[in-house]
Amino acid sequence: MERTWESLFIEEAKLLGHSEEYIQLCLDYASILKKNNLPVIFDVEHLLDYYWTGHFPWANACCRFDWAYKDYKIRKKTRGFREISAPIPTLKWCQHWIQHNILEHVVDRLSSSVHGFVQNRSIQTNALPHVNSEWIINIDLKDYFDSISQKKVLDFFLQLGYEDSVSEFLSNVCTRFSRVTYQRALPQGAPTSPLLANFLTINLDKDLERLAEELDMRYTRYADDITFSGVQKTCPVTPRDIENIIYEHGFRPNKSKTRIRYKGSRMMVTGLTVGNGVHVPKEYRKQVLRELHFAKKYGPENHCRKVRNEKGYFREWLLGRIMFVRSIDKEAGTRMLEIFNDINWMM
């Protein structure tokens, strides 16, 4: 007969001389975690010795120093750059473990209005509820990840049922010093940050959902992009009303990106048009077709030389754009892919 982990734990604990009271406390603690389908972690030593074997020498140190991250910038689709903090491999492994073994086990806590970084949801599912609206409000959360402090992350792990030292250690692994808020916060680039950000925006989502329900509006959020829409001819809420709720939850709106659009103007949600269906913007599709045309007519190398681009990078960049179009509009994307495959990339 196979023995349960409880019986093995009790036997080992008694051999180590622990009291009945201590053993029962441990079993009660473990039952809360197992009920939520979470790994049982009694203390930091247990985590490092049992779950993170082989990463023990580095796990505690690398989450405390700046050299544990490589900082770089990527160009945004609009103006400016996005700063990325990529963890070194050891720290990244630990963060992936937290992501897969803890965070993904409680993803059902997220509302159906949340579409970013959730399996089977996307910018397309985020845009779909807003199709054929009379008006749309777009609001962007400023410095989203930097706004989520280690204290909030610590409280989240405590709420899951983990004891103090384990929660503090996990929150250290998932945060770093922010040059925006001058405190430890979620780094943009850590595997754990997207889901943690979602969990720590749940209360904001609840209040915004309540507002939407009261005023017969639609609400969705994709990461830091908040969208409201409705079928009423007149919008029943102002951006300021929404921004006030955002401030109450410790976030800040990026006012330069706040937009309210009415039917007849171009209505967009997370980069997609939603006038009479979800579509890739016409300008985007035209640019892809233009690049395909010149690459096929003059050859990729000549075209890249003219636009001062590297051929290898250009090929991947163009294919990425085609696959994006295909993910939203399969027919249009497939036609683009056929042209792409007809180009002589050896030229």
Which sequence ranges carry the predicted segments?
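Right-hand nucleic-acid polymerase module
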Residues: 1-75, 81-165, 172-190, 199-206, ...
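Short glycine-enriched loop/turn motifs at secondary-structure junctions
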Residues: 78-79, 222
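Alpha-helix N-cap/helix-initiation sites
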Residues: 164-167, 219
